[in-house]
Amino acid sequence: MQIVCLDLEGVLVPEIWIEFSNRTGIPELSKTTRDEPDYDKLMRGRIAILNREGLGLPDIRKVIEGMQPLEGAREFLEWLRSYSQVVILSDTYYEFAEPLMRQLGWPTLFCHELVADESGRVRDYRLRLRDQKRESVKAFRKLKFHTVAAGDSYNDTTMLAEAHAGILFRPPENVATEFPQYPVANTYEELRAEIVAASRVR
């Protein structure tokens, strides 16, 4: 049995925080895990900026409602789900993900939770598990799944290392340079070929 683990943002959907940064005109919010490997530092900074600017969960959701999956993502995911078990491992939040998951046909998603007050002001975030991507892949391997993982950012590299095969999808140059051991796919056709090459399905 095989399972393919995919990151969400940058692989199937646009980066939510970059889109929100563009819509609000706050460049500080454009920083992502492609730029900052320390996730807690990244999130604490985001929450501080949101509170400083008087922005909350409703403002972010409004932007997400207008977003769509990356071009070709739905077709790629449809093929992949017919080929292998698939799970999305993401450092996004359930409070963000619903509109995009609906457009992708409700794939299985493991992610985190935001803590917001009654007014929608973001107070904190709650991790499902520290380094949950890696821990999920480790658990799948323990369950005797042949695991293939694909992602684009620093926070994906531990799950790529834990999987039987790891693939970088459209990574920024700094990530590709620091992790040359992983093949790079720049299109869904290339990603499909890399997954098939690493598979034990057919």
Model-inferred region functions:
Residues 95-147:
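Substrate-recognition "cap/lid" segment bordering the active-site pocket of phosphatases
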Residues 110, 182-191:
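Short acidic-hydrophobic, aromatic-tinged amphipathic segments that line or gate anion-handling sites
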Residues 94-98, 156-157, 192:
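Short, well-ordered alpha-helical microsegments
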Residues 2-113, 117-118:
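Alpha-helical substrate-recognition element adjacent to the catalytic core
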Residues 117-125, 176-183, 193-197:
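Short, charged, surface-exposed secondary-structure boundary motifs
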Residues 94, 161-163, 196-202:
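An extended, acidic
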Residues 78, 138, 157-158:
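Alpha-helical segments flanking ligand/cofactor-binding loops in enzyme cores
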Residues 86-91, 145-186:
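Acidic, Mg2+-coordinating phosphoryl-transfer loop and its flanking beta/alpha structural elements
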